[in-house]
Amino acid sequence: MSEHRPSLRRLDYHYIAMQAGFWAMFAAVVAYQTALLLERGFSNSEAGLMTAVRCLAGIVCQPLLGGFADRHPQIPLKHIVSLSLLLSVAAGAWYWLSPGMGLWETTLVWVIIGGLEVSAYPLMDAMAVQFINEGMPIRYSLGRGIGSLAYAVVCVVLGFQASSLGMESTLLTHLGLVLAEALLVATYPAYRGKIRRPGEDGPKPQSALSLLRSNPRFTLMLAGVFLGLTGIMPLSNFLVNIVTSRGGTESDLGIALFLMGASELPTAFFFQKLLRRLGSGKLLLMSMIFGTLKGVLLLCTFNCLGVLAVQPIQVLGYGLFTPASVYFVNESVPAADRVRGQTVMMVASNGLGGMMGGVLAGWTLDLGGVNLMLAACIASGCAGALLCLAALRLSRGKRNQLV
């Protein structure tokens, strides 16, 4: 690291603020995506298609952004992320100003938002990991927990906002939050440590395919995460359908989203202890098991109160997944491939998993309603958990430990 490296306090608190900002803007556009599309007259299948489009755009853009960052380490990651966010603002403004846009225009908007805004998250992770690997103990799990709280607060506020001002008003809030996040990212200290220059000796970044072929344990875990998130993501992306099927309203949806997000906050306080005790791989498996169990409990509910009561299980489900996945990647792939590894994990989980979850949810909702959707999600989650268990049984071999 440079002699003039930024203080730990600034790196830590600034990164926590970035996490809060990201999950606040994420809540404003993604948590209410299905509700907004239904409000604009789209069907469940079309809403599921838009969710799939958003995730597919991330699948394409995340490896491209990660690969570009690996090939051009002299370009600070914050410049790539902030530019991506500003381009997403332009698409979001168009979406807000054109409430009557058709299917194709709507698809294009979600391609841009999914490809540039949501895809910025793994590069934000990498911004912190660069300093963590230099011995700076940035509290990643606390940042993720505060992000969950921000998500929860924005969800409940937007629930009441949608009830009083209309669902379309949430788009304006989203634009303001993205601009604030772009400012936070742009002002984060740039990494000034030793970076590999083109032509220097040392390990070179692999392609995504080469990375998967050379690391079967990592690849099998990705497959399990993909199937697990295919079953878990619809439980939040289509929560509006679950709430209304149990007699709830838009305000109830906001409360449910608040409870879901707030339940992830306690993870920040016990994650490091669990990590030392169990390891990142077992924590990933645990997150798949409890995420699937949430679907089982939702299937057993009969009213909106039951849906609200189930949400705290998120603490051991998706609340564990995000920090555990970051540590698992950092421990499982070579140092030169860690940025790409984070993007590949994001592609398999929120990308492919979210895409297939959207298709699965939209199709089953139109075919047989909420209960059929929940049954399909449970089946996919169980398959994912079994693959994660199989990955843990593979020989660990030589691993790269988190410094």
Language-model features, listed with the residues they occupy:
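Helix-to-loop junctions at the C-terminal end of transmembrane segments
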Residues: V60-Q74, A162, T267-G279, L365-D366
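A membrane-interface helix-boundary motif in multi-pass transporters
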Residues: F160-V178, W363-C382
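Helix-loop boundary and gating motifs at the non-cytosolic
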Residues: R5-C55, R217-A256
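A late C-terminal transmembrane helix in Major Facilitator Superfamily
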Residues: V339-L367
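Hydrophobic core of transmembrane alpha-helices in multi-pass small-molecule transporters
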Residues: A20, G102-Y121, F226, G306-L320
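Cytoplasmic helix-loop-helix junction between adjacent transmembrane helices
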Residues: V111-I146
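Structural signature of the two symmetry-related core transmembrane helices
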Residues: K78-A93, K282-L297
